[in-house]
Amino acid sequence: MTPYEDKTLKDSLQEEKNKLKNMSLKDRLWYIWEYYKIPIIGTVVAVFLIFSIFSAVHNNRFETALSCVILNSQPDSEKDLVSEYFDQGFRQYLGLTDETKIDVDHSMSISFDNSNMTEFTYAELAKLSALISSKELDVMIARKDSIDHFGEMGGFLDLKEVLPPDVFDQVKDQLYEVTNSETGETIACGIKIGNTDFLKKTGLTMNDPILGIISNSTRTDTAVKLIRYVYGL
């Protein structure tokens, strides 16, 4: 690099530094996000993928029975009741061995309102998209807006076709339908679970939770068993 080029680079860096220095915190965050959001998102996705690879290598001796995300929920108890519900209660219900795990992430918070999108929101959406595209996710429990968003893109299985007759007959009035924006087909993308004891037993607070099975899930049988478990069937 020539001295001129080196000086130009230093000048550019100093100019950026001065711009940020003279901005308010709000304007500074907006500027960084507006001009650097692509590398920021790329870095987040790369870190998540690297973490997933290391996690897969570390846990390759374990078999995953089910992977579930619970979106936009708030714990109302200091005790980890979610782990008790899934890793103890549901595990016992399935009769799993110690070599089989249940993955549940209830930390994600996402929004589809463009006016409220932040770098954190983009990062969470990128993480969720990576889970779905890699076929690692089986079940999503979320509010109506999230189920609508992914359901309109064909993100869920039709529960009318997946549920066994004995289960369908008992929960058919709780099915939640969404119309695919491309095909125009309306299917039962999820099942309402707000009328069960799910929120009470998990210690979570969320509005009208709906459970959907991801369309490319590789463990649909276990996902259906989760519906049985939630409804006490």
Q: Can you annotate each of these PLM segments?
A:
Residues 117, 123-182:
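Extracytoplasmic "Venus flytrap"/periplasmic binding protein-like
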Residues 206-218:
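A bilobed periplasmic-binding-protein/Venus flytrap-type ligand-binding module shared by bacterial periplasmic
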Residues 14-26:
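Short, membrane-interfacial amphipathic segments enriched in basic
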Residues 218-229:
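Short amphipathic alpha-helical coupling segments at ligand-binding clamshell hinges
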Residues 81-137:
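Extracytoplasmic/periplasmic/luminal assembly and interaction segments
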Residues 1-10:
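N-terminal targeting leaders characterized by basic, low-complexity, disordered sequences
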